[in-house]
């Protein structure tokens, strides 16, 4: 009891959910009951996904659940009804593409609750088979003509004439649908509903039934049924016209044009809800349009009508024979399939139980007939192979093709004769049936021979086309498979290339060791280079200091020569000292030291080394030493040349050589060198007698000369020059030693 109450509560909640969503659409504001009812049923149809199912899918589901063999007045319980709905929606999902799959369980639940609310308001849990068929046929999608043909097959007799009692039952059941969406006062069932549609004194055939229900206007109680289908057909129709009330630039669905107001057009929402503006009134007559025609098309139609060359209007439906073809009684050969058979679906497509797709009346099956039914079902695929599923659906399912039955039976006889010839009576019946078919075909051969001659090539062409299509599909599938494999291979290669493998992570340890050693060696070389650059910068600073001293000495000598009474302008050392130049033998070599490494060094040294930023350290040191040596040598040569032009004594030729070894006296001959310089001064030659004689001094060349006694003559300039010469010699030796050590370390 608790479970039943819980299920009942869930059912009521789902019903309320569907109706609450319908009320949220604000459909009750539509002022016309016909449009209001059609819109509500259209909402239920789309919410339950029944607009994706046509009448043929419904018939197939009913046959799979054996409802075609049941009496229409038998009632189904909820479980059986749910099984029918499950068959419909699961088969629908198989036909739909994967991107448009529906929610099967939700659709089943919504439709089941709506049917229970419409046809079982008391909650008994049972619905008649006839009500289920009428509801599904009305709410499903597809053409209205096919649906009405199926409905007529359910309410007509074997002679093809409508039974008024069944039509009244049809109205009673189908009008429960508007009542379920709260439109019972407008379209509820009354006893006069059936009489208002057809006159009971007249026989109603299929053509009359279709003419009445598809006419314009249809019967008042069913006026919403054609509108429901027209609403579905124009749902996506576009009208490039502006609405005169809401001023929307385009319209979708129906379009309404006022017959009194000039160029006054309304969209379906404004017309349904009674919106009006300006001089327009809701009482004006409106014309409904389901499509858009350009002005040129309208002009063409008007000219065609005026010239009476317009084509006659096509009928609403094709004309069907008044007397339906009587189906053959094949109960003893092809009985109705049992419910428990596993081949029911295939057999229902290939061998129908009657000549009409809608009338399925037959006798209960027997055991022997059930076995024979299974054999026919197994033989059907072999016979219908290559003809396609459309052939089996359209021909076998709807028209009960006699040729298909004969072919199936002959195929069974050829494959398994003992099983089919169990009794002589059955054999006689089979021969009589075949003879009957042969006589009928012979009688129709004269009239149908051209058609058969044309149909044979058509069938062969269809078979060839199907074969080509299958081959093309197979080729495309193979190509698709190859493309997928290639994509997978490329993806694997990309992943392998992007992600390091364990082999790459664990390389050769020898290579790793060598790599570490190279990095250490690189660090050591960088440190040594930094040390060498620092040493070079210090040497350049020292060199700059020496050059400053030389310039200061030059200035001092020039000042003293101008102020001294014993000095003449020709004897003063006023010539500028030449700047250091690069040795021609020094070749530039690459170096990693930038020009900024001489930071703190004066401009003279930077100028001397500005062009040799890529020279190695050894060459730079040697060039610097050579430049200083050349400068001092030039100074000494100038001094010697000036003194030699004015002296009266003979000077040894070797003393005046420009070699550096003569210009740099040793410590033992320093006094002789200074005395010789003093003796060449003008003051020494023309001066008075010497007060003190130190004695003769022998220079390195062996020529004696006398040291002047005037000790004051050794002025500050001579002493400074002597000190500079000694310092220059010492610096040169030091630079050469450091360069040699650097070359040994490199």
Curated annotation (Swiss-Prot):
Domain of life: Eukaryota
Primary localization: cytoplasm
Phenotype caused by lack of the gene: Increases alpha-catulin protein in mdx muscle.
Positions that bind Zn(2+) 1: 243, 246, 267, 270
Ranges annotated as spanning the membrane: none
Annotated region (Interaction with MAGEE1), positions in chain: 1-288
SMART domains to which the protein is assigned, alphabetical: ZnF_ZZ
GO molecular function: zinc ion binding
Alphabetical list of PROSITE patterns matching this protein: ZF_ZZ_1, ZF_ZZ_2
Listed Gene3D superfamilies: 3.30.60.90, EF-hand
Keywords: Cell membrane, Coiled coil, Cytoplasm, Membrane, Metal-binding, Phosphoprotein, Synapse, Zinc, Zinc-finger
Tissue specificity note: Expressed in skeletal muscle, heart, lung and brain. Sarcolemma and neuromuscular junction in skeletal muscle. Isoform 2 is restricted to the neuromuscular junction. Isoforms 5 and 6 are only expressed in muscle.
Modified residues (Phosphoserine): 666
Binding site for Zn(2+) 2: 258, 261, 280, 284
Region (Disordered): 555-577, 646-667, 684-721
Zinc finger (ZZ-type) residue numbers: 238-294
Cited InterPro entries: Distrobrevin, EF-hand-dom_pair, EF-hand_dom_typ1, EF-hand_dom_typ2, KCMF1/Dystrophin, Znf_ZZ, Znf_ZZ_sf
UniProt xrefs under SUPFAM superfamilies: EF-hand, RING/U-box
Coiled coil: 458-557
Subcellular location: Cytoplasm; Synapse; Cell membrane
Oligomeric and partner information: Interacts with dystrophin, utrophin and the syntrophins SNTA1, SNTB1, SNTB2, SNTG1 and SNTG2. Binds dystrobrevin binding protein 1. Interacts with MAGEE1. Interacts with Ctnnal1. The interaction is required for correct localization of both Ctnnal1 and Dtna.
Record remark on domains: The coiled-coil domain mediates the interaction with dystrophin, alpha-catulin and utrophin.
Family the entry assigns: Belongs to the dystrophin family. Dystrobrevin subfamily.
Record's function text: Involved in synapse maturation and required for normal muscle function.
Full protein name: Dystrobrevin alpha
Source organism: Mus musculus (Mouse)
Gene (name only): Dtna
């Amino acid at each position: 009891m608790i479970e039943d109450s819980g299920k009942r509560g869930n059912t009521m909640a789902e019903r309320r959910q569907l109706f609450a969503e319908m009320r949220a659409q604000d459909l009750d504001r539509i002022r016309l009951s016909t449009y209001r009812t059609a819109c509500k049923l259209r909402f239920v149809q789309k919410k339950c996904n029944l607009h994706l199912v046509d009448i043929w899918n419904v018939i197939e589901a009913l046959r799979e659940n054996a409802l075609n063999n049941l009496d229409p007045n038998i009632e189904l319980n909820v479980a059986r009804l749910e099984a029918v709905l499950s068959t419909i929606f699961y088969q629908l999902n198989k036909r739909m593409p994967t991107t448009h799959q529906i929610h099967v369980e939700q659709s089943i639940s919504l439709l089941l609750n709506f049917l229970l609310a419409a046809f079982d308001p008391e909650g008994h849990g049972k619905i008649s088979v006839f009500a289920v068929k009428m509801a599904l046929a009305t709410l499903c999608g597809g053409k209205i003509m096919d649906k009405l043909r199926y409905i007529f097959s359910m309410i007509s007799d074997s002679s093809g004439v409508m039974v008024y009692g069944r039509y009244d039952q049809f109205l009673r059941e189908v009008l429960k649908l508007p009542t379920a969406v709260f439109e019972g006062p407008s379209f509820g069932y009354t006893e006069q509903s059936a009489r208002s549609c057809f006159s009971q004194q007249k026989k109603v055939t299929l053509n009359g039934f279709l003419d009445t229900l598809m006419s314009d206007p249809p019967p008042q109680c069913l006026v919403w049924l054609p509108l429901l289908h027209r609403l579905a057909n124009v749902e996506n129709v576009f009208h490039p016209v502006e609405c005169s009330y809401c001023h929307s630039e385009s319209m979708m669905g129906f379009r309404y044009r006022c017959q009194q107001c000039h160029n006054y057009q309304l969209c379906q929402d404004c017309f349904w809800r009674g919106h009006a503006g300006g001089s327009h009134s809701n009482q004006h007559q409106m014309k409904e349009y389901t499509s858009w025609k350009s002005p040129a098309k309208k002009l063409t139609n008007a000219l065609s009508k005026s010239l009476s060359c317009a084509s006659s209007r096509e009928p609403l439906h094709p004309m069907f024979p008044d007397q339906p073809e009587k189906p053959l009684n094949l109960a003893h050969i092809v009985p109705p399939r049992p419910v428990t058979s596993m081949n029911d679906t295939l057999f229902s497509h290939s061998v129908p139980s009657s000549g009409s797709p809608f009338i399925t009346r037959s006798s209960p099956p027997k055991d022997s007939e059930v076995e024979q039914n299974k054999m026919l079902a197994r033989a059907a695929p072999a016979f219908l192979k290559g003809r396609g599923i459309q052939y089996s659906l359209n021909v076998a399912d709807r028209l009960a093709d006699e040729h298909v039955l004969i072919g199936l039976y002959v195929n069974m006889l050829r494959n398994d004769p003992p099983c089919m010839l169990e009794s002589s009576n059955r054999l006689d019946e089979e021969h009589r049936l075949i003879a009957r078919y042969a006589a009928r075909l012979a009688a129709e051969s004269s009239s149908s021979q051209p058609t058969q001659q044309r149909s044979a090539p058509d069938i062969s062409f269809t078979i060839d086309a199907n074969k080509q299509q299958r081959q093309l599909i197979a080729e495309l599938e193979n190509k698709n498979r190859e493309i997928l494999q290639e994509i997978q291979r490329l993806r694997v290669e990309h992943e392998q290339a992007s992600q390091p493998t364990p082999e790459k992570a664990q390389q050769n340890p020898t290579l790793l060791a060598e790599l570490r050693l190279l990095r250490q060696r690189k660090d050591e070389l960088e440190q040594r280079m930094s040390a060498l650059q620092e040493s070079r910068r210090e040497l350049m600073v020292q060199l700059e200091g020496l050059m400053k001293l030389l310039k200061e000495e030059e200035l001092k000598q020039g000042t003293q020569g101008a102020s001294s009474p014993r000095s003449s302008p020709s004897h003063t050392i006023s010539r500028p000292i030449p700047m250091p130049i690069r040795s021609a033998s020094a070749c530039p070599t690459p170096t990693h030291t930038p020009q900024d490494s001489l930071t703190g060094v004066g401009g003279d040294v930077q100028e001397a080394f500005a062009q040799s930023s890529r020279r190695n350290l050894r060459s730079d040191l040697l060039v610097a030493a050579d430049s200083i040596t050349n400068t001092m040598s030039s100074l000494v040569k100038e001094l010697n040349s000036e003194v030699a032009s004015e002296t009266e004594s003979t000077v040894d030729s070797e003393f005046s050589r420009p070699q550096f070894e003569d210009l740099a006296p040793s410590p033992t001959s320093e006094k002789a060198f200074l005395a010789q310089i003093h003796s060449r001064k003008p003051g020494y030659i023309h001066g008075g007698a010497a007060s003190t004689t130190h004695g003769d001094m022998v220079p390195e060349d062996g020529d004696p000369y006398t040291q002047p006694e005037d000790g004051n003559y050794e002025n500050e300039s001579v002493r400074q020059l002597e000190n500079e010469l000694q310092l220059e010699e010492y610096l040169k030796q030091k630079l050469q030693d450091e360069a040699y050590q650097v070359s040994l370390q490199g």
